[in-house]
Amino acid sequence: MYDDSYVPGFEDSEAGSADSYTSRPSLDSDVSLEEDRESARREVESQAQQQLERAKHKPVAFAVRTNVSYCGVLDEECPVQGSGVNFEAKDFLHIKEKYSNDWWIGRLVKEGGDIAFIPSPQRLESIRLKQEQKARRSGNPSSLSDIGNRRSPPPSLAKQKQKQAEHVPPYDVVPSMRPVVLVGPSLKGYEVTDMMQKALFDFLKHRFDGRISITRVTADLSLAKRSVLNNPGKRTIIERSSARSSIAEVQSEIERIFELAKSLQLVVLDADTINHPAQLAKTSLAPIIVFVKVSSPKVLQRLIRSRGKSQMKHLTVQMMAYDKLVQCPPESFDVILDENQLEDACEHLAEYLEVYWRATHHPAPGPGLLGPPSAIPGLQNQQLLGERGEEHSPLERDSLMPSDEASESSRQAWTGSSQRSSRHLEEDYADAYQDLYQPHRQHTSGLPSANGHDPQDRLLAQDSEHNHSDRNWQRNRPWPKDSY
């Protein structure tokens, strides 16, 4: 009779006992799985650390200038915790190699900057999208309700600003060594400016012997704006309106400058057409602008008058160029040489370049810059170059690659000297600076003896033989190509 009887709760207690019994191995397996995951994570981090160490001995592949800020210490997804780079907008990074789609390996260009993990453009874009989504979810209702009460900008203007903000690339590819460009005290092509700059070129050639490349650039680098290089319509207009430089010539010069920078030597450009920092502001060169500054306009006038009647004819245009430069805010220049003595100005510039040299050269031994960015798979599709919101030209994608044509153009740039008349200065151009900054380096750069007017005249210590009768002088370069 008891076989068929039902005891309440018996089956439940048996089932409960079975569940409690079988749950113990489940907990153990969860712990074991967690340990396996932690072990795998440590193994991956160890391999990443080893790759980070090996990268110290690898050459620089390419360089970028940042357009955003980033704190690697706070990024928990960094392959090695605490090994992410920190940078602000407008900093420079040397990229060694690609670690993954989200991470590169490289270093911040500064003294003591160590090898670290650098977020790729895809990684930064992902972070930006997450931040935007988080901001939208945590939007303040009160602030949203106030939008209707505010005066909003015109839709077209708002859309334009939004489009610009959306297309800001996190990085711009730049030369691995920022080229040095001298401007001032006035216009290149006139004796005062040419000979003050020539004294500095000679000093740099000897001071940094074996570590520097000084090259003349006759093409108008101000045409190397990304908006022009990427827009065929603008190219046609520019080429029709400019007899000085074709876009192809400018592209060739940009490639040559990138090639020179691959050696990680200092690169100094004797750029005929560059007389103002604004001319290079929208290019991919990211130059070091050095302002050779005369103490006062009276000193400059005295120096120009000392050069004879030929230079006096163009006193006004030289003074206008001087005024344009001194009106620039100090942040427009990387170095301002306002010393009265040549020795002091030279040492000032040398100190800056020595610091830059140490910042760009990691103490770890290794070969020079060899690999182009094309060596990193998929890099050329990331559109690091170009003006905001525009596609990038083949030049900018390939400018870091070795080029036989670029090498040939660098040799041809030194063959023969161009004949140009200073009358270009009096012509009117639509561009705000072109009326002052036309190329006119056709003067013979003889070296004058120092006059006794001002200590700054010592920057003009050259021969006193000049021919002031011909307005269309051909400018002989004061140093040959072979001297480099």
Swiss-Prot record:
Main location: cytoplasm
Record-level Gene Ontology MF annotations: calcium channel regulator activity; high voltage-gated calcium channel activity; voltage-gated calcium channel activity
Bias kind Polar residues: ranges: 409-420
InterPro entries per record: CAB1-4_N_A-dom (IPR046937), CACNB3_SH3 (IPR035760), GK/Ca_channel_bsu (IPR008145), P-loop_NTPase (IPR027417), SH3-like_dom_sf (IPR036028), SH3_domain (IPR001452), VDCC_L_b3su (IPR008079), VDCC_L_bsu (IPR000584)
Residue ranges of domain SH3 in the record: 59-128
Family statement: Belongs to the calcium channel beta subunit family.
Quaternary structure note: Component of a calcium channel complex consisting of a pore-forming alpha subunit (CACNA1C) and the ancillary subunits CACNB3 and CACNA2D1. The channel complex contains alpha, beta, gamma and delta subunits in a 1:1:1:1 ratio. Interacts with CACNA2D4. Interacts with FASLG. Interacts with CBARP; prevents the interaction of CACNB3 with the alpha subunit CACNA1C thereby negatively regulating the activity of the corresponding calcium channel.
Annotated protein name in UniProt: Voltage-dependent L-type calcium channel subunit beta-3
Gene name in the database record: CACNB3
